[in-house]
């Protein structure tokens, strides 16, 4: 009954998505600074997630959370999600000159689909997309930024990126 609560709004999401991770970092900074100012411990519940990124602990956000969690008397709790039964992730290894096919189930009524493919920086991989009707796009060119393709009635927007200085994947 005597607990003090600090609530931080991350910002108003744009119509394209959720608040940016930089807003999450700013919010964490604010909470820890307030905890130091009031000389009180801070327990932070982060119920903010997405399926983007390599999830290997090397992103700028992941490293920031690691660092800021060591300041003062803080406990940062992050939910791990409940998408395991949804088969939203896959991983694997393959050898040189080995072709690997990863099938993705898409419903007829599904208006869009976001797929991310992550690899180690030093690995050289050719990636192609094959539609259910057999239209093949690729191998994808290593052109940084957005690329557009059409496969039948389907428009494909592909964004090609590279690792940041904070991540090898």
Predicted regions and their residues:
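Loop-rich non-cytosolic ectodomains and luminal regions
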Residues: 1-169
